[in-house]
């Protein structure tokens, strides 16, 4: 089996395939595993750009089982802050989004007694969702469930049907508009750091409930550490991975996938090909637009370019600071005035999320130093226009080998925009944390075009198809009906974020699911085991307001 891509979807696919007796070989364009789940070094600092919360990093749900099967968490400390996010208004007022519904309710009532009814309604829904998480199905795709399994799944949701129905049919933009307090009216849209205009209330409940259940913290070692742990699990299972290997074509004979051709002309033959990389590249380049039914053709030729159909890219500013900032908050979304917002190229909504990342991952920077991570959702088109048509990805020799992800020269206006964004954000941060500017040792700013260079993702998107809109819904319905395949092409499967919607746990689950489909097609019984090569993870609760650090088993 050839697997294209060593992101979490590809690594997961490889692990589960090895567990079920397949001999697999992962081909990865980059020199590292993880795809978007990555980090890079600048001097003494490691800049971790992915995991701000990891769904399923604690027990009590099926998500956790997947991470344990992949060896992602074992031997590590899971860290949980007592606040999911803080939203600071332009007037300095702040909303602390505690994930504990009782604490959240008390805080919100103090901020706006006039909104008591709506506050209690939201927190009641959150309480119900904490219990609901235990029955959410992640281990087996709905498309493989028999009639009895589907009925049993639906029956398990019966106690929560009202909260699910209400929360999935009400957009958060509409729900938040009911608040009388202007800060709450705006802040609720930014619970998940950025504004997700197409999201109903349900995913807000899902993330907060997971966080309250100690199953949405961060793992020791960070994003690249997580990816490397899964890669090690894959290798222990007997899997093979080749880096700096850029696939250019899926080889097809008699409507059967039989291997791949790399950019250097080498061919790798296989009985099965699984693509766990960018969906547009897979369908339109690797396969030349063949084997697409009407739904897939519409998705990848028109829907993908419609506003809001795929997740945007990010602008990310990292600062490595020479000293500690003990009063810093782990995670805060700042609502911006228009003067600052106008300086931030590609900005979708007038906000920026600021994390003092060394609170999450102290092991990734020297003692008594700080890493700041400031991000905003960004459209790609403005950055592409500033790039003046220059290449966004290129292959060249570096230290005796062909490398596909090295930095490129961009247009002069592109660099000017990067400097403007960097300087505007540093000024903003220095006003709130005096001395920050003078403490900067290293800095790094990336744009959606950086994402294109590193991963090849369409338009620099970080997560592919958006849920709750036509693109994601059409794709999920297609896979539920026909499996993660393309019509008319045998021995070919899709995995990773382009075969699902959502974040890292969805990518990891997609790997499990695609191997279940492969086993069904081959007449094999699917099996999966928890990795026992290291002890179970431990958990620590870190208060960002007053209170002691709590350790749990």
Predicted feature descriptions by range:
Residues 215-218, 248-370:
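Mid-domain catalytic core of redox enzymes
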Residues 322-446:
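C-terminal segments that line or cap access tunnels to active or ligand-binding sites in enzymes
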Residues 181-195, 426, 431, 435-501:
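A glycine-rich dinucleotide-binding beta-alpha-beta segment and adjacent secondary-structure elements
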Residues 89-92, 196-201, 251-258:
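A short, glycine/Asx- and small/polar-enriched loop/turn
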Residues 127-237, 244, 457-472:
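Active-site/ligand-binding neighborhood in enzyme catalytic cores
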């Amino acid at each position: 089996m050839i697997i294209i891509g060593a992101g979490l979807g590809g690594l997961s696919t490889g692990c589960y395939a090895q567990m079920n007796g397949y001999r697999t070989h992962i081909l990865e364009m980059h020199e590292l595993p993880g795809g978007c789940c990555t980090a890079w070094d600048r001097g003494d600092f490691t800049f971790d750009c992915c995991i701000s919360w990891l769904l399923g990093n604690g027990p009590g749900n099926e998500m956790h089982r997947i991470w344990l099967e992949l060896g992602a968490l074992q031997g590590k400390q899971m860290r949980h802050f007592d606040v999911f996010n803080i939203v600071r208004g332009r007037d300095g007022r702040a909303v602390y989004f505690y994930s504990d519904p009782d604490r959240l309710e008390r805080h919100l009532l103090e901020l706006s007694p006039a909104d008591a009814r709506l506050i209690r309604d939201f927190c009641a829904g959150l309480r119900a969702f904490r219990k609901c998480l235990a029955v959410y199905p992640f281990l087996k795709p709905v498309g493989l469930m028999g009639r009895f399994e589907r009925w049993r799944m639906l029956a398990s949701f019966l106690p929560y049907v009202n909260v699910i129905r209400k929360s999935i049919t009400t957009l958060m933009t509409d729900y938040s508009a009911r608040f009388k307090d202007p800060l709450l009216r705006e802040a609720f849209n930014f619970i998940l750091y950025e504004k997700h205009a197409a999201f109903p209330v349900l995913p807000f409940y899902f993330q907060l409930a997971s966080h309250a259940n100690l199953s949405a913290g961060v793992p020791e070692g960070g994003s690249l550490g997580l990816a490397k742990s899964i890669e090690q699990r894959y290798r222990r299972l007997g899997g093979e991975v080749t880096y700096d290997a850029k696939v250019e074509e899926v080889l097809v004979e008699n409507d059967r996938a039989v291997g791949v051709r790399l950019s250097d002309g080498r061919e790798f033959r296989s009985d099965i090909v699984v693509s766990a990389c960018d969906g547009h590249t897979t369908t339109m380049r690797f396969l030349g637009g063949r084997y697409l039914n009407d739904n897939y053709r519409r998705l990848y030729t028109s829907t993908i370019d419609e506003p809001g159909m795929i997740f945007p890219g990010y602008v990310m500013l990292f600062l490595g600071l020479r000293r500690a900032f003990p009063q810093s908050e782990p995670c805060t979304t700042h609502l911006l005035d228009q003067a600052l917002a106008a300086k931030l190229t590609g900005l979708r909504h007038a906000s920026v999320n600021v994390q003092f990342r060394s609170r999450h991952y102290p092991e990734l920077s020297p003692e008594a130093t700080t890493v700041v991570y400031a991000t905003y959702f960004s459209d790609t088109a403005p950055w592409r226009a500033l790039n003046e048509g220059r290449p966004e990805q290129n292959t060249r020799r570096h230290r005796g080998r062909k490398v596909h992800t090295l930095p490129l020269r961009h247009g002069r206006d592109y660099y000017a925009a990067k400097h403007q964004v960097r300087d505007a954000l540093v000024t903003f941060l220095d006003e709130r944390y005096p001395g920050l500017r003078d403490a900067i040792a290293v800095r790094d700013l990336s744009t959606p075009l950086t994402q294109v260079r590193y991963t090849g993702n369409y338009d620099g998107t970080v997560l592919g198809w958006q849920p709750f809109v036509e693109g994601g819904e059409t794709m999920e319905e297609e896979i539920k009906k026909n499996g993660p395949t393309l019509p008319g092409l045998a021995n070919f499967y899709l995995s990773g974020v382009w075969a699902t919607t959502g974040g890292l746990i969805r990518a990891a689950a997609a790997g499990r699911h695609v191997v279940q489909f492969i086993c069904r097609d081959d007449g094999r019984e699917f099996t999966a085991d928890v990795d026992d090569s290291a002890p179970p993870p431990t958990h620590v609760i870190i208060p960002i307001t007053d209170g002691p650090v709590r350790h749990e088993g």
